[in-house]
């Protein structure tokens, strides 16, 4: 009995396989016999049976044109064309070949595009409820308080949108990093320029100070030389006058005793006049040296003391004679 049951099951299995093979072979033959035009028409019929509605005369759905998906599917009130354009028509700027013009324009466009995408993401995030409410009012055919709630189909995340966001975020970070590097380079250049300018000013100040010191030192040496020369001239003049006075005194001593007293008085008067004259000349010479020569105060005091001692010595010698 068991063998009979097994044989019956095996026969049924073989008959099923034969039947399925006979069904598949005509289908394959039919597919092979179909021409490419029939295949295109069949695909067109399948595309027309898509959940995205085709609404002639309406504005095309931008989300569908961009991503090939629409979150509202059959409830969307925009048109969903059966054939999406592969490339959108874009006008080429005439300045695109000029690098100096094209790069700033591209930067501005990229920033505006980033802001636009951010606004779209914000609108999608915060405007879904209002949009669903508007769609429900238009297609429910009822009042707002009695309209049916429309829940959108499952939202598939487009990987291209994620890649676009990641690319814009990377470009933004690169732009920030580039701006930071440029700011650091500008700061370093400014510091270098400030350092060079400071060194130049310090060099000029040092040069001016050195020139002033050299000028003061030169004036001091000239004053010392002038003072020494004046001392030498005064010494020679004093020796000459002393020699003349000694000669006159010797002559007076050699004169006979019968000379009258008037001659001696005249001689003393002449000596007094000569002493006063020498004193006046020494005072004038001192006044001339004082404003013209710039030398330390110690040297000036020493010169005054020497002149005073010289005048006093002349007075003593004159009165002794």
UniProtKB/Swiss-Prot annotation:
Coiled-coil annotated spans: 164-290
Keyword field: Coiled coil, DNA-binding, Metal-binding, Zinc, Zinc-finger
Pfam families from the UniProt entry: zf-CCCH
Keyword Chaperone included in the entry's annotation: no
Zinc finger (C3H1-type): 55-83
Renumbered residue ranges of the record's region Disordered: 1-59, 181-269
Residue ranges, compositional bias (Basic and acidic residues): 10-29, 181-224, 231-244
GO molecular function: DNA binding; mRNA binding; zinc ion binding
Protein name: Putative zinc finger CCCH domain-containing protein 9
Native source species: Arabidopsis thaliana (Mouse-ear cress)
């Amino acid at each position: 009995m068991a063998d009979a049951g097994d044989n019956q099951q095996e026969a049924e299995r073989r008959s099923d396989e034969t039947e399925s093979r006979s069904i598949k072979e005509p289908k394959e033959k039919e597919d092979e016999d179909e021409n490419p035009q029939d295949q295109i028409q069949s695909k067109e019929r399948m595309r027309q049976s898509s959940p995205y509605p085709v609404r002639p005369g309406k504005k095309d759905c931008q989300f569908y044109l961009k991503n090939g998906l629409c979150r509202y599917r059959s409830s969307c009130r925009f048109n969903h064309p059966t054939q999406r354009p592969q490339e959108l028509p874009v006008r080429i700027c005439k300045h695109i070949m000029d690098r100096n013009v094209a790069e700033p324009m591209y930067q501005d466009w990229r920033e505006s595009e980033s802001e636009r995408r951010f606004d779209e993401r914000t609108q999608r995030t915060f405007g879904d409820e209002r949009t669903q409410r508007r769609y429900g009012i238009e297609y429910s055919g009822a009042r707002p308080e009695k309209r049916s709630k429309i829940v959108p189909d499952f939202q598939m995340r487009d990987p291209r949108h994620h890649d676009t966001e990641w690319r814009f975020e990377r470009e933004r970070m690169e732009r920030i990093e580039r701006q930071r590097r440029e700011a650091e380079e500008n700061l370093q250049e400014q510091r270098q320029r400030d350092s060079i300018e400071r060194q130049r000013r310090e060099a000029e100040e040092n040069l001016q100070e050195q020139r002033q010191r050299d000028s003061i030192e030169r004036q001091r040496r000239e004053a010392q030389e002038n003072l020494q020369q004046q001392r030498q001239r005064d010494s020679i003049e004093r020796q000459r006058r002393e020699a003349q006075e000694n000669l006159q005194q010797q002559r007076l001593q050699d004169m006979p005793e019968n000379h009258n007293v008037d001659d001696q008085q005249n001689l003393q008067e002449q000596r007094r006049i000569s002493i006063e004259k020498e004193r006046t000349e020494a005072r004038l010479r001192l006044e001339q040296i004082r404003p013209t020569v710039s030398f330390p105060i110690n040297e000036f005091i020493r010169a005054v003391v020497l002149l005073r001692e010289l005048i006093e010595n002349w007075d003593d010698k004159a009165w002794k004679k």
